[in-house]
């Protein structure tokens, strides 16, 4: 019997093993809450393309690094775009959803981003340091990330690879948004324990920093996370704009913040479903 409620396909890899966190717990919690307003089914990311046409919206959440299933993800994107399937987060993003080319582009344009290059001959444009970080353009969750000495850079295969100086920072901080609205912020006050997150109270400058990247991105409907580091001189530098499947660390916020987030997510999904 039809309920008349919007039908949502929630995409998650419940078995994905993340370092220091259990992503599946977050999706179990969110789907339990969303069922109050939607007819909802959960599926693995490799099944999303086959199932998505029976739903009013597809919510992509903790679906694991695309690096592990690039061809299948590209096929899902193409099919969803061609047939007009509503996807949350929208597939128009220019952040991690499209790879990490945006880090190169934003750095070249003078935005406050960790200096980034993708060619050995451009390493001289980076701040001088003895240690660098190399990571895949289509990586996520630190997959494929390696730390290399300056003298070892010529031995790297720069195909789809980014290189950055290893930054000496005070702490990492993340700002969480639904559509273009700020929800909460968390930070890791101890850099060696980056998964031990605590509530962060951003000031006006912090919020302006995060909002500039949300406004730059081509996403109207979806969840985005702006990851930054606080340099020793006090400046914030963008680490990542995660607009594909950002982990939300909802277990690290207080119940009232968690409730407000669920309410905002519900409202955003209803807006997406109502879109012509």
Task: Give the location of each predicted region.
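Phosphate-binding site of ATP-dependent enzymes
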Residues: 141-237
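A short beta-strand motif that forms the metal-chelation/ATP-contact edge
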Residues: 55-60, 135, 175-177, 184, ...
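Flexible loop residues that form catalytic
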Residues: 13, 63, 121, 137, ...
């Amino acid at each position: 019997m039809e309920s008349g409620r919007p039908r949502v396909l929630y995409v998650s890899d419940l078995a994905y093993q993340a370092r220091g966190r259990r992503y599946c717990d977050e999706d179990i919690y969110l789907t339990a809450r969303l069922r109050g307003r939607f007819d909802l089914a959960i599926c693995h990311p490799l099944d999303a393309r086959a199932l998505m046409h029976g739903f009013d919206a597809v919510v992509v959440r903790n679906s694991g690094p695309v690096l592990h299933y690039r061809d299948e993800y590209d096929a899902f994107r193409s099919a969803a775009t061609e047939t007009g399937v509503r996807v949350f987060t929208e597939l128009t993003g220019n952040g991690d959803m499209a790879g990490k080319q945006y880090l190169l582009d934003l750095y070249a344009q003078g935005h406050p981003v960790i200096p980034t290059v993708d060619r050995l001959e451009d390493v001289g444009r980076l701040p001088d340091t003895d240690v660098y970080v190399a990571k895949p353009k289509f990586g996520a969750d630190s997959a494929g990330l390696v730390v290399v000495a300056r003298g070892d850079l010529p031995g790297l295969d720069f195909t789809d690879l980014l290189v950055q100086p290893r930054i000496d920072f005070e702490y990492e901080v993340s700002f969480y948004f639904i559509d273009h609205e700020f929800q909460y912020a968390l930070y890791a006050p101890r850099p060696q324990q980056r998964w031990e997150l605590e509530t962060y109270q951003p000031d006006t400058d912090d919020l302006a920093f995060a909002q500039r990247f949300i406004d730059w991105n081509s996403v109207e409907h979806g969840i985005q996370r702006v990851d930054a580091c606080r340099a020793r001189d006090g400046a914030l530098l963008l680490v990542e704009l995660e607009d594909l499947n950002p982990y939300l660390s909802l277990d690290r916020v207080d119940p009232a913040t968690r409730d407000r987030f669920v309410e905002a997510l519900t409202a955003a999904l209803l807006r997406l479903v109502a879109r012509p």
